[in-house]
């Protein structure tokens, strides 16, 4: 029995390569089968974005914004980066900015978890809190104010094309590669900025025309499902909070406005169905 145990013991061999920087490990996250939640006859997989080095899909957005800004000359060596975030984008930016030597200032409503602030500060970011009564729109305006006042680089995750573009070039291609021998019938995603659904859908709509794309949002904050237009300024940024938004239980999921990045998915009908989910159900299924 001991011999059999050694024979079948799990082992690894390494990746066979060395990395020049932590940012080079972003992406190529695995699709993992979830064996205990799906109905009979259904194979359910998750794209495990927590395998990214700072723990979320926002690492992709962070490296894309910084590197594309460097290429364009919009971000100068040593220049301070500023962004409004509920957490994960700030954590991803803190990692990328630390690796590349940029100071980072994050604006965040004081309603978001203390753990997120601590992690961003641990990674070297300065965190500026805004009143929760001003919601996401308040921290968004504070970031713009600081950028204009100090000549800082505003990451603009809610408007920049660098957001959806990175998902078009990476996330979508990874999904196609992982499912090249397996039929994929549905792609289900929520939204924050809208970068994932917009970038992935650009590719999957073309390559997998029979695939159904399901967009999820909080049941009590159905800003897309309301069909009410988002007021915008001349540059596409939100002019105010969306009237259909209400506070919900999942932090970072669905801001109180429709980002310009998400607007592309709405205008081009990149999704086939909206799936509202209650906060309590979302938490319960995450635990399961």
What is each stretch, according to the model?
Residues 29, 47-49, 65, 85, ...:
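Fold-independent oxyanion-binding glycine-rich loops
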Residues 5-79:
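Positively charged, low-complexity intrinsically disordered leader regions
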Residues 67-74, 91-103, 121-122, 201-208:
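Alpha-helix C-terminal capping segments
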Residues 52-54, 134-136, 161-165:
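Short, small-residue-enriched loops and turns at beta-alpha junctions
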Residues 80, 89-146, 219, 223-238, ...:
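Active-site-proximal loop->helix
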Residues 150-195, 199-203, 264-268, 272, ...:
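Active-site/ligand-binding-proximal alpha/beta "capping" segment
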Residues 14, 26-28, 140, 206-288:
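Active-site/ligand-binding loops adjacent to catalytic centers
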């Amino acid at each position: 029995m001991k011999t059999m145990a050694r024979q079948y013991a799990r082992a690894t061999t390494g990746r066979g390569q060395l990395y020049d920087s932590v940012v080079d490990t972003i992406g190529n996250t695995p699709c993992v089968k979830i064996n205990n939640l799906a109905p009979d006859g259904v194979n359910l997989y998750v794209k495990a974005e927590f395998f990214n080095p700072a723990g979320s899909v926002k690492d992709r957005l962070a490296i894309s914004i910084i590197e594309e800004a460097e290429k364009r000359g919009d971000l100068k060596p040593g220049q301070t980066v500023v962004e409004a975030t509920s957490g994960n984008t700030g954590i991803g930016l803190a990692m990328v900015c630390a690796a590349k030597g940029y100071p980072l200032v994050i604006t965040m409503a004081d309603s978001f978890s203390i753990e997120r602030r601590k992690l961003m500060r641990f990674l070297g970011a300065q965190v500026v809190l805004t009143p929760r009564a001003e919601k996401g729109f308040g921290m968004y305006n504070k970031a713009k104010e600081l950028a204009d006042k100090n000549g800082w680089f505003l990451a603009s995750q809610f408007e920049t094309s660098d957001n959806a573009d990175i998902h078009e070039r990476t996330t979508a291609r990874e999904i196609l590669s992982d499912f090249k021998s397996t039929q994929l019938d549905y792609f289900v995603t929520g939204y924050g900025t809208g970068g994932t659904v917009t970038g992935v859908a650009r590719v999957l709509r073309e390559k997998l025309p029979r695939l159904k794309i399901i967009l999820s949002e909080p049941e009590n904050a159905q800003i897309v499902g309301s069909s009410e237009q988002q007021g915008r300024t001349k540059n596409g940024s939100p002019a105010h909070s969306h009237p259909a938004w209400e506070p919900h239980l999942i932090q970072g999921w669905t801001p109180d406005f429709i980002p310009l990045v998400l607007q592309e998915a709405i205008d081009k009908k990149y999704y086939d169905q909206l799936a509202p989910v209650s906060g309590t159900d979302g938490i319960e299924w995450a635990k399961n």
